[in-house]
Amino acid sequence: VEALCREFEVLFYLDETVTGFRVAPGGVAELYGLKPDIVTYGKALGQGFPIAAIAGPNHIMESIEYGKVLHYGSHNAPRLGLFATKTMLEEMSRGNYAGYKKISEIGDQMAKRLNQAAADTGQNMRVQNIGSMFHPVFTDLDAITNYRDFCQTVNLAKYADFSQKMRDQGVFF
């Protein structure tokens, strides 16, 4: 997608609302070597507080100045959210970003243990993760690598039942 945007001289926008400040300090852009022109952030950025951010180079961001481009937002600069964000960024970046390494290790261990539990109980559940983000799927494939595989092989009814049973136990994901 990025290559096509460059070819046709269209801005490359990356939505990191879910992944930004969660899978790596620079989100999936960092993990996959992407160079977006505009990026949006949310969720992990505020650590549960309503906050969002738009980032890009000066020549693009200047267009958001008052009067040039209409921009509204429901998560613009809440003080408590800004404090939580500042604190999270400071803590996660200490020790050469040790916080990100730690949550990534925890995510890897969680996925590994859940996959082992599924195998031990004969379930066709696979837990895939990128750092601390993980998701279980019910499939006979070893891994889901594209949307077609997901649509053709994942047992959504079994996932819905599993999700409900987990919620009944107070586990939400």
Please place each PLM-identified region on the residue numbering:
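Conserved N-terminal phosphate-binding loop of PLP-dependent enzymes in the Aspartate aminotransferase
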Residues: 1-173
